[in-house]
From Swiss-Prot:
It comes from Escherichia coli (strain K12). It holds the Pfam family Fer4_11. [4Fe-4S] cluster 2 binds at residues 57, 174, 177, 193. This is Hydrogenase-2 operon protein HybA. Residues 1-27 form the signal peptide. Keywords: 4Fe-4S, Iron, Iron-sulfur, Metal-binding, Oxidoreductase, Periplasm, Repeat, Signal. [4Fe-4S] cluster 4 binds at residues 124, 145, 148, 151. Its cofactor is [4Fe-4S] cluster. Participates in the periplasmic electron-transferring activity of hydrogenase 2 during its catalytic turnover. It is found in: Periplasm. InterPro entries: 4Fe4S_Fe-S-bd, 4Fe4S_Fe_S_CS, FDH_Electron_Transfer_Unit, TAT_signal_bac_arc. [4Fe-4S] cluster 1 binds at residues 47, 50, 53, 197.
Length: 328
């Protein structure tokens, strides 16, 4: 290729690059909650820390207990391949005043939050994690899972746990007791933890009705009395209890795009190891980045293809012309 054709090709490449639109950085958007999606409301102020929910969860999901031995408060307060649901306690100072920041303590229930737009689903390369299109429950398929554990890194709540002792490998997380082989919800039952909670600290229902109930509680006057329901809002099983001073925030309404497990507390949620997250879901953010990268890759490839065709054509013309014209 002579100098004239080289300059011509370079100029055309620059024009092609300038003519192509720049990569769009349109803001990612949250996926809307599935209408009627199922979830739980956990009211930390009602929890008595009995761990009945933990035991029931293990009875349903792990009939063979952790081989490390009997579970007690000291070794059963962390999520593991043998425990999908746990109760942790936070303390401050002397730790004698329930749901108080000063010299107080509070309980927190930990399990999969069933995010509205879950990042674990977004990052899974083989779709071993899927969000049920009707219930919104995040389900796991062990037969598809490759054990890459991307979901463990992606989860902002550090929920999925991998069983390294299983020769085939397996992930464990809460599926609201409706996974294949259990299907309590499909059979008309309740998640085990909801069924056995004596204080109604965790109740089951649609995200919409649970959110309405949570906001109703936040509007109650501290010191007044309220009929708190057990199991579900429509169970008819309620008990009269003094309204605490709630921390004025419903966790899970907007955090990370929203969750189907909602939390009310009497102390700042940061104290209970609930992460502070942006309103934009992690799933939406990661997918937007992926799509932007893929779109961005196409532009330089298109330019490169155009330049390649132009160079090949000019090279062929050079052969026909008999070589360089030696212009300076």
């Amino acid at each position: 290729m002579n100098r004239r054709n080289f300059i011509k090709a370079a100029s055309c490449g620059a024009l092609l690059t300038g003519a192509l639109p720049s990569v769009s950085h349109a803001a990612a958007e949250n996926r809307p909650p599935i209408p009627g999606s199922l979830g739980m409301l956990y009211d930390s102020t009602l929890c008595v820390g009995c761990q009945a929910c933990v035991t029931k969860c293990q009875d349903i999901n792990f009939p063979e207990r952790n081989p490390q031995g009997e579970q007690t408060w000291s070794n059963n307060d962390k999520l593991s391949p043998y425990t999908n649901n746990i109760i942790q306690v936070w303390t401050s100072g002397t730790g004698v005043n329930k749901d108080q920041e000063e010299n107080g303590y509070a309980y927190i229930k930990k399990q999969c939050m069933h995010c509205v737009d879950p990042n674990c689903v977004s990052v899974c390369p083989v779709s071993a994690l899927k969000k049920d299109p009707k219930t919104g429950i995040v389900h796991y398929d062990k037969d598809v899972c490759t054990g890459c554990r991307y979901c463990m890194v992606a989860c902002p709540y550090n929920v999925p746990k991998y069983d390294y002792n299983n020769p085939f490998g397996a992930l464990h997380k809460c599926e609201l007791c409706n996974q294949k082989g259990v299907e309590r919800l499909d059979k008309g039952g309740l998640p085990g933890c909801v069924e056995v909670c004596p204080a109604g600290a965790v109740i089951f229902g649609t995200r919409e009705e649970l959110m309405a109930e949570a906001k109703k509680r936040l509007a109650l006057k501290p010191g007044s009395e309220y009929h708190y329901p057990r199991q579900t809002l429509k169970s008819g099983d309620t008990y009269l209890h003094t309204v605490p001073k709630y921390y004025p925030h419903l966790y899970g309404e907007k955090e990370g795009g929203g969750t189907q497990v909602l939390v009310l507390t009497g102390v700042p949620y940061e104290n209970l190891d609930l992460p502070k997250l942006d309103d934009l879901s992690t799933g939406a953010r990661s997918e937007n980045i992926q799509h932007t990268l893929y779109k961005g890759m196409m532009l330089p490839l298109a330019v490169l293809a155009g330049l390649t065709v132009l160079v090949r054509r000019n090279t062929k013309n050079d052969h026909h012309d008999g070589g360089d014209d030696h212009e300076s």
